[in-house]
Every structure is written in C-alpha cells, then in structure tokens.
Amino acid sequence: KRKRDAILKILRASARFYLNNLNSGHADAHIDYILSRKLSSSTVRKFGLGASLDFKSLPQYLLDQGFRREDILDSGAVVESDRHAGRLIDAQGGRLIFPIINALDDVVAFGGRVLEKMDFAKYKNTRETSVFNKSKNLYNINLLKKQKKATGLKNIIMVEGYMDTISLYQAGFTNVVASMGTALTKEQ
C-alpha cells in the first residue's frame, strides 16, 4: 500500500510537471503540434496534455520533491540511462505527454509522442508497472466513467490511440476510449 501510494503520488507530480512545462513558454514544438491537430485549449486541459522538454529535468524535479529514487524508478516515468550508468532520465524525454488515467482518476502511466520524424515508433507508453498494465487499461476510461454515471451510455466507441480519442471527444463523441495500440482484451 505504501509503495502503491508513493508511485501514484510520483505519477501525479509528474503529470503536473509536464502540464507546467506545456504552459512554460518553452514548449513551442509541442504547442505547434497541438495547433496542427486543431485541439482547443479546453480539450488540452480536459485531457491534461503536457510536455517533456528534455531527459533530465523530470528526474531532478522528482528527487527535489523528496521522492525516493527506488520509487521514482518503479513508477516507470523515469528510467536509468543505457549510456550513463546510474543516471536517471525521463522515459518520455522530449515528447508530447498524454497522461493515462484509470477509472479511479489516478494517473497510472504516460503516453508520449515524438514531435519530429524519427526512425522509431511515434508513440511510447510507460512500461508496465505495479499500477499500470496496458492490456487492462483503456485511455479515457476516467471521463467515460463520469459520463456514464451522469447520463448513462448506450454505446462506446473504441479506437486505437490517444489522438483518435481526443479528436473524437472534441468533435462531440464523448463516449470514446482507446486500447492504446493493443488488441482488445477480456479485462478491458
């Protein structure tokens, strides 16, 4: 329980950090991408989108907040560098950040999108952790659950990714969730 609570606090602090980065005046490439996808500021706020500006600042921020190194690593938001033994780096370094929030409204992971063409996948999720299993989570389940409680739902639209979900939600199709690139599982 202590470990789980610590990890959830780290992920919540990371989400706030990314959100502050997006609004810092230093996230021009991230803002340009958001504008190119025609997302409104209210949509960006509703989904808590953020920005990782580099590989170093998130780990340092979390350490400065007094979180334990072991818990920071166990959160999946930060990893050890392959190039520099013992150095902590942001697992989503440089990406546009999509917080993944569970049905209980806890930030459990992050999806990140690279902003320029690369030789690797455009999207990357936090690795599986004690609080995040990709095959058991749906992106936007938190907002869908609130909508179901408020108005009831007859249908759910299932899509593959974050941007599909956000774009449809903004267009008025608020009964949408994403499987985050995995095949639909029984748990989902």
Task: Annotate each predicted stretch with a short phrase.
Residues 2-4, 8-43:
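Non-catalytic interaction/clamp surfaces of large macromolecular machines
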Residues 1-7, 11-13, 55-188:
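Phosphate-handling DNA/RNA-contact segment within nucleic-acid enzymes
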